[in-house]
Every structure is written in C-alpha cells, then in structure tokens.
C-alpha cells in the first residue's frame, strides 16, 4: 500500500515539475516576444523621427536655395544644377543605421490632376496624356483607354469618356467593388484603381505627379517624354530642348519660348514656368533590420515659408526620375 502511495506521490511531483516547466517556458517566450516587440516599436519611432529630420533638412536646403536665388525675383528659376537637386551624402546614424534624403521636383512631371479644370475635362490635356503614354511605349489599349478612365475618375459626372471610359457602373462590378472618386488625385498610387497593372504603373510613375490642377509645368526639370507630350514635338526635338537648357536651365519663360519657336512649335495653352512651388522629399531610413521611407510633398511660398502638403509612409521608395537625355528609354517596351 505504501509503495502505491509513493508511486502516486512521485507521479504527482513529476506532473507538477512538468507544469511548472511549461509555464516558465511560456513566460520566457512571452517575455522575449515582449522585448522584441518593444525593440521594434522603438526602432519604428526612431525611424519616424529620423525621417522627419530628413524632411527638416530638405526644408532648410529649399529655404537657402530661395535666398540664393533672390526672394524678390519676379520669375524664380529652379533647375537641376541647383543644390537641392544634387544627390546628398548618406548620413550615418548613431544606432548604426543610415539616412538618405532626396529632393525632387514633381512640377517637371505630367500633372494628372491637370486633365480637369473645375471638375470639367480638358480635351487638350487628355490628348497630351495620351501622347505621353505613346512616347513611353505603353501598350495600345493603355494609350487609348487610360486617359479616358483618368478623366472619368477626376470629373464630376457619371458619363463615361469615349469608348473605354469608366464610371461607378464599371467599378461596382469589381471585387471588391468601389466607386469613381470624382475628385482630384491625392496620390499617384490611385492610378492602380484604373485597371493598370503593377508593371505599367511602375513604368509610368517617374513621369507623373498629383499636384493642384493649376500647377504649371517646370520646363527646367521636365524629362524628354513629358516635354514631347506637352508641347506636341517629337522626342528628338525634346532632347534638343534638354541640351539647350543645360544644367543651369532656362532663365525665363521667354528664353524657353524662343527656343521652342526655333524648333517650329508653340507653347499653345500649356501652363508652364521655369521654377516650381512644389517639391517632393524622400527620406529613407535604414535602422537595424527595418527600412522606413517617408515621402513628403512640400509647397514653398515666395516668402520662403514651407508648408507640408502631405506625408506618406506607405511607399517602398521611389524610383530615380528620368531627367532627360536617353535614360528614359531604358525600360521602353
């Protein structure tokens, strides 16, 4: 009888030890997960503040650029030879990470919101966008269909443009269903909603922007495809413009107009300038095993005040934009 009791006691002790071991192991695992989670949260917060630091640095560079160019200049000039447009040296961080900052001019791209004026479609702008797609070598169905779908996305009505336009009745058939925005783009990523593949979206991305509809094109930073599309000239003539402006750019709208006239073309109804009010700052932070990208859209006033129009933490980094010459042909299909 006593042997049986001893056996039960031994089993009970072993069971208790096993339970305690399992509980302790669970506590240790939970503690490790909590520590790892805290470290990740710390890295996220650190990366966010480092990225904001990159944005502040860009603001300082842009203010200095305006001072050097003269705040009272009637026609401010912004070109690719200025300090803001040059690659910045990566900044080493105390935690072993790295901060990279790049400033771009979205006014040198085709403004998608420019297809409408007061929510009404501008046929000339639709044609310009179609020429851009053709110049980039996009598929014919995209060249013909995307401009109409974009116009429908931006305008106020529910009447499809052309044969390949799309309004709510088409998008409600998608899975999941959605509606046309009938407003301006807040971000160029909305193009993905217009039945555009990821590969085609990436191909188009360096050449388009989503600025206020009245934002003029900066001819000093525009690429060959954009210049060709906007001013209805062939790519060879657009390359001639890029060569003529050089690194210092055109110093006035008249300079650009004269050169365009020499090529046998006119500015037409294109709204253009030799400077810009808008800048895009890409702050990329590498910290530990994390990589964080902050894309900030800034507006710089003539008085040097800078306003943050938008911040986007959801980007995986933006491609280096095409700035002219033959580099835009590399991915041409």
Curated annotation (Swiss-Prot):
Q: According to the UniProt record, where is the region Disordered?
A: 313-333
The subcellular localization recorded is: Cell inner membrane
Family (UniProt): Belongs to the GSP K family.
Protein name per the record = Type II secretion system protein K
User: Which PANTHER family is this protein grouped with?
Assistant: TYPE II SECRETION SYSTEM PROTEIN K (PTHR38831), TYPE II SECRETION SYSTEM PROTEIN K-RELATED (PTHR38831:SF1)
Q: How does this protein assemble?
A: Type II secretion is composed of four main components: the outer membrane complex, the inner membrane complex, the cytoplasmic secretion ATPase and the periplasm-spanning pseudopilus. Interacts with the tip of the type II pseudopilus subunits XcpV, XcpU and XcpW. Interacts with core component XcpT.
Q: Which residues form the propeptide?
A: 1-7
Keywords, alphabetical: Cell inner membrane, Cell membrane, Membrane, Protein transport, Transmembrane, Transmembrane helix, Transport
Q: Which residues cross the membrane?
A: 8-29
Q: What is its main location?
A: membrane
Chain segments annotated as coiled-coil in the UniProt record: none
A GO biological process of this protein is: protein secretion by the type II secretion system
Give one Pfam hit by family name: T2SSK_1st
Q: How is it modified after translation?
A: Cleaved by prepilin peptidase.
> Which Gene3D superfamilies does the annotation name?
EpsJ-like, GSPII I/J protein-like
Chain ranges sitting on the Periplasmic side read 30-333
Offer a single GO CC term for the protein: plasma membrane
Q: What does this protein do?
A: Component of the type II secretion system required for the energy-dependent secretion of extracellular factors such as proteases and toxins from the periplasm. Plays a role in pseudopilus assembly and seems to control its length. Interacts with the pseudopilus tip complex that is critical for the recognition and binding of secretion substrates. Type II pseudopilus confers increased bacterial adhesive capabilities.
* Domain of life, source organism: Bacteria
